[in-house]
Amino acid sequence: MTKMNVESFNLDHTKVVAPFIRLAGTMEGLNGDVIHKYDIRFKQPNKEHMDMPGLHSLEHLMAENIRNHTDKVVDLSPMGCQTGFYVSFINHDDYDDVLNIIDQTLHDVLNASEVPACNEVQCGWAASHSLEGAKTIAQAFLDKREQWNDIYGEGK
């Protein structure tokens, strides 16, 4: 396989076992700041995907709530394949803490009574949301918390 510019295009999606959270890359800025990008894979690539309303609500809930647990988040974005999200942190390379931050954020999702910014002023497709869908996705991921660091399903 030819090396691609996009890191995830170099990942063999047939070898990974979701759910997992993996360090997908780092980038150092001119002033020494380091961005750590993590792949939060909720669904098995090419076998499952998140339905868009649930994914969309999960994005809103995670993007808003993760910042209550750390000031190191640069961005949280959904993958176009609908199998996961990317989250980027600045100057924060503690993998175990990242797992805990994601855990806390997903518990916030379970406790949510509404989707933040779920309106036409603050969202580009406000009609496409499902709080219950987001909660179902979050619970399924939390149910397999012990697998998050086992990217290839090796029982490690």
Swiss-Prot record:
Please state the Enzyme Commission number of this protein. 4.4.1.21
Instruction: Locate the residues binding Fe cation.
Output: H56, H60, C123
Q: What class of enzyme is it?
A: lyase
One Pfam family of this protein, by short name?
A: LuxS
> Which cofactor(s) does the record list?
Fe cation
What Gene3D superfamilies does UniProt report for this protein, alphabetically?
S-ribosylhomocysteinase (LuxS)
InterPro entries, sorted: LuxS_sf, Metalloenz_LuxS/M16, S-ribosylhomocysteinase
Q: Name one GO biological process term.
A: quorum sensing
Is-annotated flag, keyword Oxidoreductase? no
Recite the UniProt cofactor note for this protein. Binds 1 Fe cation per subunit.
Catalysed reaction, written as an equation: S-(5-deoxy-D-ribos-5-yl)-L-homocysteine = (S)-4,5-dihydroxypentane-2,3-dione + L-homocysteine
Q: Which UniProt keywords apply?
A: Autoinducer synthesis, Iron, Lyase, Metal-binding, Quorum sensing
Q: Which family does it belong to?
A: Belongs to the LuxS family.
What is annotated about its quaternary structure and interactions?
A: Homodimer.
- Protein name as catalogued: S-ribosylhomocysteine lyase
Organism, by scientific name, is: Staphylococcus epidermidis (strain ATCC 35984 / DSM 28319 / BCRC 17069 / CCUG 31568 / BM 3577 / RP62A)
What lineage is this protein's organism placed in?
Answer: Bacteria, Bacillati, Bacillota, Bacilli, Bacillales
